[in-house]
Regions:
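Aromatic/hydrophobic pocket-lining residues that form π-stacking "cages" and hydrophobic walls in ligand
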Residues: 1, 29, 55, 297-298
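Short N-terminal edge-element motif at the start of the domain
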Residues: 168-181
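Glycine-rich phosphate/pyrophosphate-binding beta-alpha loops
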Residues: 173, 191-202
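Active-site beta-strand termini and strand-to-loop segments that position acidic
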Residues: 179-185, 209
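C-terminal helical cap and adjacent loop that interface with cofactors, partners, or active-site loops
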Residues: 128, 198-332
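Predominantly a Rossmann-like dinucleotide-binding segment in NAD(P)-dependent oxidoreductases
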Residues: 39, 46-170
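Beta-strand-loop-alpha-helix segment that lines the small-molecule cofactor/substrate pocket
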Residues: 1-48, 62
Length: 332
C-alpha cells in the first residue's frame, strides 16, 4: 500500500507500524521513496509519549552523560486479544481466525507461524531517537533469542479445556523474545517482546549513561551527584516535570482529547505540519525501515540458532552525514 501511494504520486505517506514482513519488503519501500523523492513516515506514537520526550530532553542536555545502554520492548498481556468467543472483542473464549473477532482474526496467526520480535517499534523508536540512529549512528548487528512457548496453550486449556481445537495448535512464538542490538557508536540495546504471559503493561524503557539512568517500570531516575540520596532512586515525577519537552509545554491543551494519552495528537501534528511546510518528516523512511526490520532480522537470527547477523544500512552510508531532526523545538 505504501508503494502504491508513492507510485500514484503522493509525496507524503503516513504508515501504521510495521512497514513490511520480509527484509526485502523494507528495501522495496526505501527504494520507492528514494525513486519518487517522497516522504514516508511511520506513525510511531510512543516517540511522542510525554515521559519519553522529557527523557530525550534530558539526554540532549547531558543529564545522563554519554549514553551507554538502552532498553525497551513490547510487554503486554495479549492473551484475551488473541482469543475470544467471536462475540466480544476481548476474552470470553478461545476462538481465533475465522471464528474469532477483531484482532483475534489475524494476530494469533502470527504466533502460530512466526518466532521473533513481532512488534518492536514502540520500544525501539524512542530509544533510537536518544542515540541519533540514522543520523550519526546506526544499528550495526542484531542477535535474538526466544524462550519456550507455554503461555497461549496454557491459557486455552484453562478457559476452553484440553479437548478444545485451539488446544491442539502448536504455537511457534516464544513467550519471551529477547533481542540485542549493537550500535556503530558503541551503545547496546536490549529489546523484549512479551505478550503471551500474565503481566501488567510496560514498554520496559531504560536509558543509561555515564552519569545516571531512567527506568520507566519503577518510574525512577538516578543522576549521580544530583539525586536526593546516594545509590537511591528519585521518583521520576519531579525530573520529568522539570525537563518537560517544549513541544508538550506548548501543545498540551490541544492534545487533551487525543488518543493514547495525547501521543496521537503529536505524531499526527508532526506529519501534517511537515506536509504544510513542505519539509522532511521528523521520522523518515530510513527510520521506518530500520525499526520495522527488527522483526524480520530477529526471526532470521532465531532460525539460524541465535546467530548474530549484520544489520542492513538502509541509508547506504548517509547516516554518517545526516543531522538529527526529531523534535528539536516546540513546533513539531
Amino acid at each position: 500500500m505504501i508503494i502504491g501511494c508513492l507510485e500514484a504520486g503522493i509525496k507524503y505517506v503516513g504508515s501504521e507500524v510495521i512497514i513490511g514482513i520480509t527484509l526485502e519488503d523494507h528495501w522495496e519501500v526505501v527504494r520507492a521513496a528514494e525513486k519518487h523523492k517522497a516522504e514516508v513516515m511511520m506513525l510511531e506514537n510512543v516517540c511522542y509519549r510525554r515521559d519519553v520526550m522529557a527523557i530525550l530532553n534530558m539526554v540532549r542536555q547531558g543529564l545522563f552523560g554519554e549514553i551507554i545502554h538502552l532498553q525497551g520492548g513490547y510487554q503486554h498481556d495479549l492473551r484475551d486479544v488473541k482469543f475470544n468467543d467471536g462475540k466480544h472483542v476481548h476474552g470470553f473464549g478461545v476462538e481465533f481466525g475465522a471464528k474469532g473477532l477483531s484482532e483475534a482474526r489475524w494476530r494469533t496467526e502470527h504466533a502460530i507461524h512466526r518466532n521473533g520480535d513481532l512488534y518492536p517499534t514502540h520500544g525501539i523508536g524512542p530509544i533510537a531517537n536518544c542515540i541519533n540512529i540514522n543520523r550519526g549512528n546506526r544499528f550495526k548487528s542484531i542477535c535474538s533469542f526466544a524462550s519456550k512457548t507455554r503461555g497461549l496453550h496454557d491459557y486455552v486449556v484453562k478457559l476452553g479445556g484440553e479437548n478444545h481445537p485451539s488446544a491442539k495448535v502448536n504455537f511457534k512464538l516464544g513467550d519471551i523474545v529477547t533481542t540485542s542490538i549493537n550500535c556503530m557508536n558503541g551503545e547496546t540495546i536490549l529489546l523484549q517482546h512479551d505478550t503471551n504471559l500474565p503481566r501488567p503493561y510496560s514498554l520496559g524503557f531504560r536509558v543509561q549513561g555515564t552519569e545516571g539512568l531512567w527506568m520507566d517500570v519503577n518510574n525512577s531516575i538516578y543522576v549521580e551527584n544530583k539525586a536526593a540520596k546516594v545509590h537511591q532512586w528519585d521518583d521520576a515525577k519531579d525530573w520529568l516535570e522539570k525537563y518537560d519537552h517544549p513541544l508538550w509545554k506548548r501543545w498540551v491543551k490541544e492534545s487533551v482529547d487525543a488518543g493514547h494519552g495525547g501521543m496521537d495528537f503529536f505524531v499526527l501534528h508532526s506529519f501534517i505540519e511537515s506536509i504544510k511546510r513542505k519539509t522532511s518528516t521528523p521520522m523518515d523512511v530510513y527510520d521506518a525501515a530500520s525499526w520495522s526490520a527488527i522483526t524480520a532480522l530477529s526471526e532470521q537470527s532465531i532460525e539460524l540458532g541465535n546467530q548474530t547477523i549484520d544489520f542492513p544500512d538502509f541509508t547506504n552510508g548517509q547516516w554518517m552525514y545526516r543531522k538529527p531532526v526529531f523534535c528539536l523545538n516546540d513546533e513539531f
